[in-house]
Amino acid sequence: MPQKDPCQKQACEIQKCLQANNYLESKCQAVIQELRKCCARYPKGRSLVCSGFEKEEEEKLAMKSGSK
C-alpha cells in the first residue's frame, strides 16, 4: 500500500483557500507558506505535492548559476 503523502493536508488547505478566494494566491500566502514548511521537512521526492516547489527551487538555482 502506498504511503500517505506527508504534505497532502497542506495541499488540500491551499485548494480550499484558493477556491474561497477566487484563486487569488495573494489571499492564501499563509497556507502556501505552511506547505513550503512541510515540504522543507521531507527529503526531495518524498512528497508528490511538493514536486512543484522542488521544480521551482531548481529553476531558481539554475537561473542564479547562469547569471554569474
Curated annotation (Swiss-Prot):
Entry similarity comment: Belongs to the CMC4 family.
Residue window of motif Cx9C motif 1: 7-17
Native organism taxonomy: Eukaryota, Metazoa, Chordata, Craniata, Vertebrata
Source organism of the structure: Mus musculus
Domain notes: The twin Cx9C motifs are involved in the recognition by the mitochondrial disulfide relay system.
Intervals of motif Cx9C motif 2: 28-38
Record flagged with keyword Transcription regulation: no
Annotated ranges, domain CHCH: 4-46
Lineage: superkingdom: Eukaryota
Residue pairs linked by disulfide bridges in the UniProt entry: 7-38, 17-28, 39-50
Gene3D superfamilies: CytochromE C oxidase copper chaperone
Gene: Cmc4
The protein, known as: Cx9C motif-containing protein 4
